[in-house]
């Protein structure tokens, strides 16, 4: 505790010094985000309030789960790492200015944080004021009535319509008009869990390909254009293309089964339509069928596209997939943004860039992308939080507001753009990717009857046979999926 208090005092002193230096430097530019403890609050809550040292306990991932999983909630100290230190400064500012101490509650590795929250609620201990964890695991709590609807809290301390909260998450995951999950600039793991296309710049040069960045800017980045580029990268050392990284065969693209779902979502095709009075499956919608047919025309090109799941034991082949790209032998590889922090890409001797997921075709207006629901974190407040509800909402709003001011640029510029991608084009692509995500209730809730694979795994069922028969595959699963959806509607949409 003494170490924690000392570090916070040190950080507050540093913030004060930053103000003095800023005035002495006559406004000279500084690459590190500058913080004003007494000012720069325009746009934050009109009622500035001091909470007298109130603690807000946030249950989240184990510290070693992901890069930044400890730093984004409650970093222990300043460690000369830009993102960690920006989060630390944010929390110190909130404590000094508003009297709220953000305390991370980190499970041990392998410990079930959802079970911890349930036990906390049923025991009456009420230790956890908010949970920040993967949406796929948090979501069922909403159907059980264990989470607050942010629309219904009514204390005026949290504003889900503000730009520091992910507006498409609010839109796409509204359940009967209720908002149970929020995410945004309070954290960075939401961005880390976002899907994109990694591409090899060296192969673009070697094969004299059109500039992928310009294709995106021109609005022409779609399945057909991507397939044309994929077909131009083809090197084989034997009679058949090898998925062994040591062989050195070159692929236009390497993928795995989960990518199918993310390609379809990037093409604007969700499993569930959540725009009507109640959600409904749209897998057999004619547009969805057309887009999947176009997608499989590209991804089932076995000469140029290597699907890891078809090459052997999936876990081993997923490793091979990554190594093929890292070795410089694949033009494209879809994956989450988080892999830039992994040892493989950090040590890879290739020049790579980043692109949004491709559109389906010219009929699609905007680029969009989605996330890995097993890693995408959201904030939710358990209904057991009564006495500290106001302080919790105030803290979350402050975390997001000051996260946008202090952390987002550090994460974008220092960690992603220049430390990992090292070009201005990738920053442009990151802006494009992050500003237009979409979310699908069919993946988040994985609807099923409790006895089989859920809707999240629909496209996986087609891979084994390289099938394009979406209609009959859906017919075989329709009752299973709709049983889960019907139960969901009964729980959440009953009058």
Predicted region positions:
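Glycine-centered hinge/linker elements that transmit conformational signals in sensory
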Residues: 227-230, 270-315
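Extracytoplasmic/periplasmic solute-binding protein
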Residues: 59-62, 125-131, 135, 175-197, ...
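Conserved N-terminal structural module of periplasmic/extracytoplasmic solute-binding proteins
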Residues: 2-11, 16-144, 406, 464-495
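Short, solvent-exposed loop/beta-turn-alpha elements that line the ligand-binding surface or hinge
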Residues: 152-164, 216, 244, 269-290, ...
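Hinge/lid segment of periplasmic solute-binding proteins
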Residues: 38-54, 61, 108-111, 136-195
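Extracytoplasmic/periplasmic substrate-recognition and gating elements
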Residues: 345-416
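Conserved C-terminal helix/tail region of periplasmic/extracytoplasmic solute-binding proteins
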Residues: 383-393, 403-495
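Short helices/loops that flank or line small-molecule/ion binding pockets
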Residues: 114-127, 138-144, 227-232, 316-331, ...
């Amino acid at each position: 505790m003494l170490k924690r208090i000392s570090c916070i005092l040190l950080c507050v002193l540093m913030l004060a010094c930053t103000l003095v230096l800023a005035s002495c430097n006559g406004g000279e530019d500084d690459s590190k985000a500058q913080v004003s403890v007494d000012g720069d609050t325009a746009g934050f809550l009109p009622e500035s309030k001091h909470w007298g040292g109130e603690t807000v306990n946030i249950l989240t991932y184990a510290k070693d789960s992901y890069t930044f999983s400890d730093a984004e909630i409650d970093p222990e100290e300043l460690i000369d790492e830009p993102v960690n230190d920006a989060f630390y400064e944010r929390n110190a500012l909130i404590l000094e200015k508003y009297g709220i101490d953000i305390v991370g509650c980190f499970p041990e590795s392998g410990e079930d944080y959802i079970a911890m929250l349930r036990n906390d609620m049923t025991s009456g201990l009420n230790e956890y004021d908010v949970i920040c964890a993967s949406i796929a695991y948090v979501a069922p709590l909403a159907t059980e009535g264990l989470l607050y609807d942010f629309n219904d809290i009514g204390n005026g301390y949290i504003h889900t319509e503000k730009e520091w909260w992910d507006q498409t998450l609010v839109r796409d995951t509204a359940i009967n008009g209720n908002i149970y999950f929020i995410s945004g600039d309070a954290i960075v793991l939401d961005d880390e869990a976002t899907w994109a296309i990694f591409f090899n710049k060296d192969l673009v040069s070697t094969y004299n390909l059109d500039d992928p960045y310009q294709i995106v800017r021109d609005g022409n980045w779609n399945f057909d254009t991507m397939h044309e580029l994929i077909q131009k990268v083809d090197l084989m050392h034997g009679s058949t293309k090898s998925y062994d990284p040591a062989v050195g065969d070159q692929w236009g693209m390497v993928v795995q089964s989960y990518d199918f779902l993310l390609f379809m979502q990037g093409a604007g095709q969700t499993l569930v339509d959540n725009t009507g009075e109640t959600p409904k499956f749209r897998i057999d919608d004619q547009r969805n069928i057309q887009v999947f047919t176009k997608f499989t025309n590209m991804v089932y090109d076995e000469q140029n596209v290597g699907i890891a799941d078809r090459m052997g034991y999936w876990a081993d082949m997923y490793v091979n997939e990554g190594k093929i790209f890292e070795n410089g032998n694949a033009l494209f590889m879809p994956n989450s943004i988080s892999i830039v922090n992994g040892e493989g890409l950090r040590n890879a001797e290739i020049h790579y860039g980043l692109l949004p997921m491709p559109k389906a075709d010219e009929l699609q207006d905007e680029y969009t992308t989605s996330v890995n629901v097993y890693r995408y974190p959201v904030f939710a407040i358990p209904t057991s939080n009564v006495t500290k509800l106001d302080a919790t909402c105030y803290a979350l709003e402050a975390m997001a507001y000051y996260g946008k001011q202090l952390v987002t640029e550090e994460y974008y510029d220092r960690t992603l753009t220049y430390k990992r991608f090292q070009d201005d084009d990738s920053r442009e692509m990151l802006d494009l990717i992050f500003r237009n995500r979409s979310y699908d209730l069919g993946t988040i809730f994985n609807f099923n009857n409790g006895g089989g694979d859920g809707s999240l795994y629909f496209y996986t069922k087609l891979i084994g046979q390289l099938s394009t028969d979406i209609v009959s595959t859906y017919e075989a699963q329709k009752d299973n999926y709709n049983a889960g959806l019907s139960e969901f509607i009964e729980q959440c949409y009953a009058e």
